[in-house]
């Protein structure tokens, strides 16, 4: 029996999963690599705060219960987050007055 997926859990596009895998090369991405690649505007402390308060909605996992355990983001969660942010940007763009009349 497969585990159930919560209805609110976004399912990433396969293309996004493949792209993120090509970038990072593993199913678990070290949190610091995520910050350095896609959140370089945030230092370690501000990135940690943004994760803790939910401003950056990425679930963080470890492979050990130790407080010193290395932190990771699962590839599918990272891909879903990228898709979600891209969709939000597209929705915001379409909602702007005159967005249809701007030539590409």
Curated annotation (Swiss-Prot):
Keywords, sorted A to Z: Activator, Antibiotic biosynthesis, Bacteriocin biosynthesis, DNA-binding, Transcription, Transcription regulation
Name of protein: Transcription regulatory protein PrtN
One of the record's GO molecular function terms: DNA binding
UniProt source species: Pseudomonas aeruginosa (strain ATCC 15692 / DSM 22644 / CIP 104116 / JCM 14847 / LMG 12228 / 1C / PRS 101 / PAO1)
Lineage: Bacteria, Pseudomonadati, Pseudomonadota, Gammaproteobacteria, Pseudomonadales
A Pfam family recorded for this sequence: PyocinActivator
Nucleotide-binding as UniProt keyword: no
Function: Activates pyocin genes, probably by binding to the sequences conserved in their 5' non-coding regions (P box).
A Gene Ontology BP annotation from the UniProt entry: regulation of DNA-templated transcription
Entries under InterPro entries matching the protein: Tscrpt_reg_PrtN
Coiled-coil positions: none
Domain of life, source organism: Bacteria
């Amino acid at each position: 029996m497969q585990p159930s997926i919560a209805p609110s859990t976004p399912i990433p596009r396969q293309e996004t999963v493949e792209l993120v895998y090509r970038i990072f090369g593993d199913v678990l991405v070290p949190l610091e690599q995520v910050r350095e690649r896609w959140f370089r505007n945030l230092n370690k402390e501000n990135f940690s705060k943004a994760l803790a308060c939910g401003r950056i909605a990425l679930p963080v996992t470890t492979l050990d219960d130790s407080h010193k355990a290395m932190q990771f983001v699962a590839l599918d969660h990272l891909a879903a987050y990228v898709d979600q942010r891209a969709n939000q940007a597209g929705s915001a763009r379409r909602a702007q007055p005159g967005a249809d009349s701007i030539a590409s």
